[in-house]
Amino acid sequence: MGGKMLRSVSELIYKVYARYLLGQINLNNLPGHVALIVDGNRRWARKEKRDRISDGHRAGAGKAVDFLHWCDELDINIVTLYLLSNDNLKNRNRQELNDLVQVICNLIAQVSKRWKVNHVGSCENLPELLGNSLEGVKSSTKTNRYSERSMTVNLAIGYSGRAEITEAVRKIVNTYPIGDLPEKITEEVISANLYTGGLSDPDLIIRTSGEQRLSDFMPWQSTHSEFYFLEALGPDLRKVDFLRAIRDFSIRRRSFGA
């Protein structure tokens, strides 16, 4: 009985604190585009003494879906989830990669039922199962069954920031005559040819696990982004952590390099 009472009190305090944080947020200065670098899944699995690393990836994916709901509640327009980098594809062992691909495929199916989904990355080196899942997302998005106010979710899968910029420049070089290139290679044209072409850059980038680096994530688009680093591992991310990040952003005065 004592344990149940303690849990009830703890849950009540948590709800009150979440409501307090929400009240501190300047709703007139919310980010239009939030990106989340989902990190720490493997460390979480080891910390929790799980038999399989995939348990950590599965828990992290579940928390990513929670994160999307939290963003949707605040009417944030665009959310980008960094799920699988090119380095992950090269460096993870086959079993872990196979498990991770299955987790991501399940996540894609779940997210695409509710929100508009874009793939941000290259399909070139992706496992066939994952590539097929992303192709299915393209088809479902074309049916235009989402409302105009539906949040857009970018899934960064098979992503590398350096590769993205390189590919954008190649597109430009292959599009225009050589003599026109000096005038055509501008910031605006490069931005338009990135995976995220046509979308706004992230206003706020959140990273879990205590690491304070970008890990090749959107080096071009993050020039004027605000950053918020969390000690919590991906699966341990809480709504109050999210609300603190949004509160912090909402009261910052952004300089945009000035």
Swiss-Prot record:
What does the cofactor field's note say? Binds 2 magnesium ions per subunit.
Q: Does the keyword tRNA processing apply?
A: no
Q: Active site: which residues?
A: 39, 88
Enzyme class, first EC level, given as a word:
transferase
Q: What Gene3D superfamilies does the entry give?
A: Decaprenyl diphosphate synthase-like (3.40.1180.10)
The UniProt keyword set, sorted, is: Magnesium, Metal-binding, Transferase
Q: Where are the transmembrane segments?
A: none
Give the EC number.
2.5.1.-
Q: Which PROSITE patterns match?
A: UPP_SYNTHASE (PS01066)
Which residues are involved in binding substrate?
40-44, 52, 57, 85-87, 92, 207, 213-215
In terms of superkingdom, the source organism counts as Bacteria
The record ties this protein, via Pfam families, to: Prenyltransf
Provide the residue positions that the database annotates as binding Mg(2+): 39, 226
GO MF terms listed in the record are:
ditrans,polycis-polyprenyl diphosphate synthase [(2E,6E)-farnesyl diphosphate specific] activity; magnesium ion binding
- Required cofactor names: Mg(2+)
GO biological process assignments: polyprenol biosynthetic process
Q: Does the keyword Isomerase apply?
A: no
- NCBIfam families cross-referenced by the UniProt entry: PRK14828.1, uppS
The entry describes its oligomerization and partners as:
Homodimer.
What family, per the record? Belongs to the UPP synthase family.
State what this protein does.
Answer: Catalyzes the condensation of isopentenyl diphosphate (IPP) with allylic pyrophosphates generating different type of terpenoids.
**Protein name in the entry:** Isoprenyl transferase 1
What organism is this sequence from? Tropheryma whipplei (strain TW08/27)
Species lineage = Bacteria, Bacillati, Actinomycetota, Actinomycetes, Micrococcales
